[in-house]
Amino acid sequence: METNFDQIVEQLLEAPYWVIDFLPMQVPQDSKGQFFAVEQYYLQEPQHERLCHQFVDVLLKLNCYSDLFVSRDGGDEWLYPDPKMLEKWLTESLQNGHLCVLIDDGEALITASGGDTNLTLYNPSPALLELVRQLATAAGLFLWQPSTDRNC
């Protein structure tokens, strides 16, 4: 890649994004449901491990179609990560850390952060968006774009 990894990530974090999530849409701020209690439930074991495996399924299958260029906690970057290492890094990042995955030669980005119950996909092409939607659905997850409505 012509520019460095961190610069590419920084630019992509400003791009339109979609959420890969266990929920089918954004929960409104004024929802009468128990989003935070449910989110905490999914952050506990064994639910968290199951959720991590669903996300790993998406990334590993995506790696069959596209190169993944991965950085963990802002450290070194790896192209063609071993599937077991990618699983380990993602699981660790979702517990306590941060993972950045560049896709399509740095045109798109997936991030995972500790304490989150979702992945975030930035700047996908229409083809990548459709592929990730299919992979997420197959893994029992949803792909949605956040609302610009301030009530959400």
Model-based region annotation:
Residues 1-118, 123-152:
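Structured alpha/beta or helical-core interaction and ligand-binding surfaces enriched in interleaved
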